[in-house]
């Protein structure tokens, strides 16, 4: 519940209030007592006591008309649509929605310890590590790209890396109702670009890495813009953990100089001194030897990042050790074995840098023929297509099958051809993803060989023309073709 007086107070304090406009009359205050028992940005979810946020580049007046027909009596907007109900006009609808939602749900962020991860890759894996560390002796909720849990028991698929602010604070409130003590979440650059976490301060923020990604017409116009929005997490955290090996580390180091911080990686006090496939040793604040199920040094680095963050939240080294040992992540370096002994690696690697690291791990263990099944999504991250080509060109013996991966409103054949145009040798294009995986499974001969299925991980859908069409998921499809 929230009153109109409280809403106006919030907006005025944030210098985000213009006026209330109704029948061409302007109001700075509203004398009538009005209380809202629901918030919505979806015109299909409206009742008479709902406050509606008219937001988005594609918003149309007919959506507002539909909401008014359903009983809407007030809305918030940057634009006066000339409707027959009062409008609260603001300078920034996204800022307004975040702060009003925060208050509506009784500031649940103050009742949870908040841990956030950002970075081009590794956010989900690091979040899972932190979740398992905290779970040993606490009650953490988690919002991740892969799965969300608000009670530690039931899990559901997330639609956005970071939810819309209204949904985010509703989820936090549910976690509080479920007596959760901590919230682990991923914070994307888009979350700051679209102000989904506006006004939110995290107890610990972690910056894992940065490389060019999410650059395109509907995302970030430049790498500078992408990097800037990533760094906003540092300014909005009470303590930070940063990878000292990341590109452009010096600017981040300077930015966090006066914030309590830990660095990890080479040239820092928290460093891996021994790395085996399923164990590693750390010097520094986390000094110990750790067992780990996820292979690859980059996963060990993600574990250190999560461990340092949890240490700042009061988690013991023993709980950190147990958490790392227990962590698995759906769609992250999942391994199957064909009857001929060849390995199938299913991984979410979905940009050039993560593909590069995935190939390095597989090539370290598999010395025979390696087949890569790969695609790129439509209508986003267009720079990935060239990046994939550049990485593939560094592996001349790699056999490549290009296929569909969430083509959305683009033609998957055109996407595959664009990737192929950046590759310096012939590749195979099989648009049907299951057919591509089936074909790859026929190309191995012995235990030294491997198939890498990259991009979708555990996602059991294909995004086609704005819809999530059913797809079994790469792991389930690969299981069908183990006989070789």
From Swiss-Prot:
Location of the protein in the cell: Cytoplasm
Pathway linked to the protein: Cell wall biogenesis; peptidoglycan biosynthesis
MF terms in GO: ATP binding; magnesium ion binding; UDP-N-acetylmuramoyl-L-alanyl-D-glutamate-L-lysine ligase activity
Main location: cytoplasm
Gene Ontology cellular component list: cytoplasm
Segments carrying motif L-lysine recognition motif: 405-408
Pfam families with a match to the protein in the record: Mur_ligase_C (PF02875), Mur_ligase_M (PF08245)
Modification type N6-carboxylysine: residues: 230
Changes after translation: Carboxylation is probably crucial for Mg(2+) binding and, consequently, for the gamma-phosphate positioning of ATP.
Cited HAMAP family: MurE
Protein known as: UDP-N-acetylmuramoyl-L-alanyl-D-glutamate--L-lysine ligase
Gene: murE
